[in-house]
């Protein structure tokens, strides 16, 4: 469950390390985001000479949550961290590599992220 002020790891090579959720997109008073939801983030930590700078406001898709994902068969997939992948305005990933596992729930809307990820659960 991701809400405003949640700090997330960045799971791509865009250059950002940590981002903070500043808005959950997809509704006027939407409070929480889950895996596959798009959020507005502010870059809090970035490596030098990278594609994104500290303080930049961007869109991101949530790829891992500590709360986990409940599947239709009743299984639950949980992760150790909350992570997101940065997106441009066309909802395409900025980075060219995805680090760590991602879930199959991203398949409908973010096939590019699934193809870049090394491990899909």
Swiss-Prot record:
Pfam families: Ribosomal_L14 (PF00238). GO terms for cellular component: cytosolic large ribosomal subunit. The keyword Ribosomal protein applies. Keywords: Ribonucleoprotein, Ribosomal protein, RNA-binding, rRNA-binding. The keyword Ribonucleoprotein applies. GO terms for biological process: translation. It comes from the Bacteria. Binds to 23S rRNA. Forms part of two intersubunit bridges in the 70S ribosome. Part of the 50S ribosomal subunit. Forms a cluster with proteins L3 and L19. In the 70S ribosome, L14 and L19 interact and together make contacts with the 16S rRNA in bridges B5 and B8. Belongs to the universal ribosomal protein uL14 family. This is Large ribosomal subunit protein uL14. The lineage of its organism: Bacteria, Pseudomonadati, Pseudomonadota, Gammaproteobacteria, Legionellales.
